Design a protein with these regions (language model features):
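A generic structural signal for short beta-strands and their flanking turns/coil linkers
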Residues: 23, 41-43, 60-62, 92
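Short beta-strand-centered aromatic/proline hotspots
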Residues: 55-74
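Short coil-to-beta transition motif at edge beta-strands of beta-rich domains
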Residues: 36-53
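Hydrophobic beta-strand residues in large extracellular and virion-surface proteins
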Residues: 4-6, 42-47, 66, 94-98
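Contiguous surface segments at macromolecular interaction interfaces
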Residues: 61, 75-129
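Compositionally biased, charged N-terminal/linker segments
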Residues: 1-41
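Short histidine-centered beta-strand/loop micro-motifs
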Residues: 17, 36-38, 55-58, 77
Length: 129
């Protein structure tokens, strides 16, 4: 099945999601942010600790269902007598519900500025490799 993949997610966070079933993540990395923009409540997403550059066939991850999504903009203004500087940063918060473990069959799309898409299949906890 085809999924949007969020890469470089901390192993500890994936373990917490497995144990507690429902967690909210704040996504700030540009590539994962683009992926989250392509998700809606009810969609499934693949989370993996593997970096974007190392994502290949056989990579393992966790499939989770998106319960909620929220995109926000944070503005920071700093100034002195000479200038005023305003910076904005966008982030997304997604609430995820753990579904199952999965293994990537193939990477469909891995282009900069576009959601990372993979074809993955669910795996049981007894499947060895």
């Amino acid at each position: 099945m085809e999924y949007i993949a969020l890469t470089g997610i901390a192993d500890s966070l994936i373990e917490v999601l497995k144990k507690h079933n429902l967690r909210t993540l704040e996504i700030r990395s540009p590539q994962n942010f683009v992926g989250v923009l392509g998700l809606n409540a009810g969609d499934s997403v693949l989370l993996t600790s593997t970096s974007l550059q190392d994502l290949t066939d056989g990579t393992q991850g966790l499939i989770a269902k998106v319960v909620q999504k929220q995109v926000s903009v944070h503005s920071v203004v700093s100034s002195n007598e000479l200038y005023i500087e305003e910076r904005e940063a966008m982030s997304a918060r997604i609430q995820l519900e753990c579904r199952c473990m999965a293994r990537v069959r193939s990477v469909i799309s891995n282009e900069l500025g576009k959601p990372v898409k993979v074809d993955a299949r669910e795996i049981s906890c007894y499947e060895a490799r």
